[in-house]
């Protein structure tokens, strides 16, 4: 069924948004098979973003853990410092093709906001970024960067003032400005066609990783690990391997202060179905079906839902989803990788690194793990120092 992954996905939106989604899907279906559009997209990915990103053998980490061979997919080396630009670039080119003059986006950690503002600056489009007031405090450097790029950062004061509320506000704004405005949704969630569209703009990660590991090792990996908030970097690296049953796909969610505390963002771990931002997926909710606040030290993971394709992969057991606490992410992810490889990962990516550290030690040396380093950690220095200061 269109826009569905089994029962997950769909378009649970008011009529005003429905018309915009129909227009968007129509435009997207035209460009995805349009050689000129895809060539332009690949040109900017290669020469503006700096793709392909390397698949790096983490020799020190591998030796230190004494188990599986670990490779890092270096999305942190992209222009703007994360995987987000792969999608922002594709969608802004689509907005341009549709004749839209303005783009809007939501952002949590600020990486998607920076990526959207960057590409909007490049193509001369007006840009408005919706960001929860709480995240504005946590990510001051990214806010300044967006403003420097010419974007207007709109503080969202509703709810708990984080990513969830920013998405709600962006959709609301889009519904009443649809004639000249394009909404660049930052993750593989929301109503159809966004989950499919974002995945297809992020699959370049997995397409490259597949080619690279075959060149380096002559075979596919045994495990692929990626952090999961909304889930776009993870679905991007997973998708080209979905039909390779021998490759274990593991998404790593944020366990925050511990699942038992209720202060976490482990949506799939909790496995409760609900409707959020126009999609049916797993959603953190209370006994009355109200959406709960998600929590993580990582501003990019504290989303109370997850992309519908991840819900589908979890339900069909094609992928498994684990969770890592703030403490593990900081010490066994962020600090560990920085010290041992000289690579500072984003706090989001640090969750996957920390799980890789656990997993690698249980495997033999003939096994191969690829970890998606979805972004770099410069933006997280303040959060990590504050966390360590509190300890």
UniProtKB/Swiss-Prot annotation:
Q: Which domain of life is it from?
A: Bacteria
Its Gene Ontology cellular component terms are: cytoplasm
Q: In which pathway does it act?
A: Amino-acid biosynthesis; L-tryptophan biosynthesis; L-tryptophan from chorismate: step 5/5
Task: Kindly name one Pfam family recorded for this protein.
Answer: PALP
- CDD domains reported in the protein's UniProt record: Trp-synth_B (cd06446)
The chemistry this enzyme catalyses reads: (1S,2R)-1-C-(indol-3-yl)glycerol 3-phosphate + L-serine = D-glyceraldehyde 3-phosphate + L-tryptophan + H2O
What keywords appear on the UniProt entry?
A: Amino-acid biosynthesis, Aromatic amino acid biosynthesis, Lyase, Pyridoxal phosphate, Tryptophan biosynthesis
Which Enzyme Commission numbers does its entry carry? 4.2.1.20
Cofactor dependence is on: pyridoxal 5'-phosphate
Q: Does the keyword NADP apply?
A: no
Molecular-function annotations in GO:
tryptophan synthase activity
**Residues passing through the membrane, by range:** none
Residues where N6-(pyridoxal phosphate)lysine is found: 84
* NCBIfam families to which the protein is assigned, alphabetical: trpB (TIGR00263)
Q: Report the function annotation for this chain.
A: The beta subunit is responsible for the synthesis of L-tryptophan from indole and L-serine.
To which protein family does this belong?
A: Belongs to the TrpB family.
**Quaternary structure annotation from Swiss-Prot or TrEMBL:** Tetramer of two alpha and two beta chains.
Protein's name in the database: Tryptophan synthase beta chain
Origin species, per record, is Clostridium beijerinckii (strain ATCC 51743 / NCIMB 8052) (Clostridium acetobutylicum)
Question: Which gene produces this protein?
Answer: trpB
């Amino acid at each position: 069924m269109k826009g569905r992954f089994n029962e997950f996905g769909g378009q649970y939106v008011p009529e005003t948004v429905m018309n915009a989604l129909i227009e968007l899907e129509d435009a997207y279906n035209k460009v995805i098979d349009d050689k000129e559009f895809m060539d332009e997209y690949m040109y900017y990915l290669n020469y503006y973003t700096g793709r392909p990103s390397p698949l790096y053998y983490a020799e020190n980490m591998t030796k230190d853990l004494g188990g599986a061979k670990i490779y890092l997919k270096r999305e942190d080396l992209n222009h703007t410092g994360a995987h987000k630009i792969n999608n922002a670039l594709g969608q802004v080119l689509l907005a341009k093709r549709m004749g839209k003059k303005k783009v809007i986006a939501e952002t949590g950690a600020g990486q998607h906001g920076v990526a959207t503002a960057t590409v909007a600056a490049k193509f001369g489009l007006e840009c408005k970024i919706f960001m929860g007031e709480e995240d504005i405090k946590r990510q001051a450097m990214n806010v300044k960067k967006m403003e420097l790029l010419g974007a207007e950062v709109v503080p969202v004061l509703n709810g708990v003032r984080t990513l969830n509320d920013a998405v709600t506000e962006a959709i609301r704004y889009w519904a009443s400005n649809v004639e000249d405005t394009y909404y660049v949704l930052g993750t593989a969630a929301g109503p159809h066609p966004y989950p499919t569209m974002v995945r297809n703009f992020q699959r370049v990660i997995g397409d490259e990783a597949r080619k690279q590991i075959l060149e380096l090792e002559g075979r596919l990996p045994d495990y692929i690990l990626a952090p999961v908030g909304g889930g776009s970097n993870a679905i991007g690296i997973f998708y080209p391997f979905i039909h390779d049953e021998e490759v274990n796909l593991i998404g790593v969610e944020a366990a925050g202060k511990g699942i038992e505390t209720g202060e976490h963002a482990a949506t799939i771990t909790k496995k409760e179905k609900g409707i959020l931002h126009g999609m049916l997926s797993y959603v953190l909710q209370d006994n009355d079906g109200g959406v709960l606040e998600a929590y993580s030290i990582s501003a990019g993971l504290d989303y109370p839902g997850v992309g519908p394709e991840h819900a589908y992969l979890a339900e069909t057991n094609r992928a498994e989803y684990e969770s890592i606490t703030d403490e593990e992410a900081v010490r066994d992810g962020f600090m560990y990788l920085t010290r041992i490889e000289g690579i500072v990962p984003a706090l989001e990516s640090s969750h996957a690194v920390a799980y890789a550290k656990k997993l690698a030690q249980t495997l033999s040396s003939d096994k191969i793990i690829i970890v998606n380093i979805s972004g770099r950690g410069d933006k997280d220095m303040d959060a990590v120092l504050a966390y360590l200061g509190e300890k």
